């Protein structure tokens, strides 16, 4: 007797073995109750870039709100939906405005997010529309007040990030304005899933998603201590790959690495 999928529960391929576990559903098929805080160490670096070059990587109906590239490097540990395991991620976004059918939405558009484990990549791509792909991401290591990490693909180092507590940002007030934009409504994503067959050139799904900043949390969500925040100097080093270096991602790193930066801040 064949199975019947339960439309009230979440599934991901392969669906043959029952509902899946995601950040939004536990093994009993209910919402996860995060009774233990996820430990998050987050480093962010912001730098100016050429407005025309940034606009060239935006989808239709998006416009550039400010000529900045924002790179987040997060280390997540004690993640409840991963049974206490953790992973690293690095996301690249730009401040934008999306002109939708019902109005204009302002927020950062996530261009790409690298993660070092398949589980968060799959759930984020399929359920939330994140443009997630895989890379090896070193843990942040710190010595003498300088924190560093690097990203590699097939052994090719394509991105280095450095955060220096020994020096201040070049323009602290502007940095705060970019990172704490009061007009931002959240993080936007451009979801695209190709249709099977027909040359694989058409979309099964293609639309803009929003993670709203003002989303109301359930009443049973615990409150945890406020984040500890430090501003410091930083530096970005992109290494431009060939196709042989990063066979399926070379065009991503080439495009981002070609965005010239005149000013670097974190």
Q: Which role does the model predict for each range below?
A:
Residues 65-99:
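Short, structured protein-protein interaction patches enriched in aromatics and acidic/basic residues
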Residues 28-33, 55-61, 81, 96, ...:
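Intrinsically disordered, low-complexity boundary segments flanking structured domains
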Residues 41, 88-90, 143-147:
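Residues at beta-strand starts and edge strands
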Residues 48, 74, 95-97, 114, ...:
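Structured loops at beta-to-helix junctions and adjacent beta-edge loops in soluble globular domains
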Residues 93-128:
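Hydrophobic alpha-helical segments and helix pairs
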Residues 2-26, 124-265:
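Interaction-surface and assembly-scaffold signal
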Residues 23-73:
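N-terminal ordered "arm"
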Residues 81, 101-105, 174:
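Low-complexity, polar-biased intrinsically disordered regions enriched in Pro/Ser/Thr/Gly
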């Amino acid at each position: 007797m064949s199975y019947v999928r339960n439309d009230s529960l979440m599934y991901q391929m392969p669906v043959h073995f029952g509902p899946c576990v995601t950040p939004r559903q536990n093994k009993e098929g209910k919402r996860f109750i995060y009774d233990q805080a996820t430990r998050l160490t987050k480093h962010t670096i912001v730098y100016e870039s050429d407005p025309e070059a940034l606009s060239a990587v935006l989808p239709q109906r998006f416009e550039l709100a400010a000529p900045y590239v924002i790179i987040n490097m997060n280390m997540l540990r004690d993640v409840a939906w991963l049974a206490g395991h953790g992973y690293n991620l690095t996301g690249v976004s730009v401040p934008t405005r999306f002109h939708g059918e019902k109005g204009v939405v302002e927020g950062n558009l996530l261009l790409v997010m690298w993660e070092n484990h398949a589980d968060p990549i799959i759930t984020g791509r399929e359920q939330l529309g994140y443009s997630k792909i895989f890379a090896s991401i070193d843990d942040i290591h710190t010595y003498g007040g300088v924190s560093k990490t690097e990203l590699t693909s097939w052994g090719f180092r394509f991105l280095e990030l450095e955060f220096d507590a020994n020096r201040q940002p070049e323009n602290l007030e502007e940095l705060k304005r970019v990172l704490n934009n009061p007009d931002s409504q959240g993080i936007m994503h451009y979801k695209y899933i190709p249709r099977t067959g027909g040359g694989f050139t058409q979309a099964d799904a293609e639309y803009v998603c929003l993670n709203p900043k003002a989303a109301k949390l359930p009443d049973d969500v615990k409150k945890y201590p406020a984040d500890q925040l430090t501003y410091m100097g930083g530096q970005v080093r992109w290494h431009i790959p060939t196709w042989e270096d990063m066979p399926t991602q070379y065009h991503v790193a080439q495009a981002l690495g070609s965005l010239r930066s005149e000013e670097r801040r974190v």
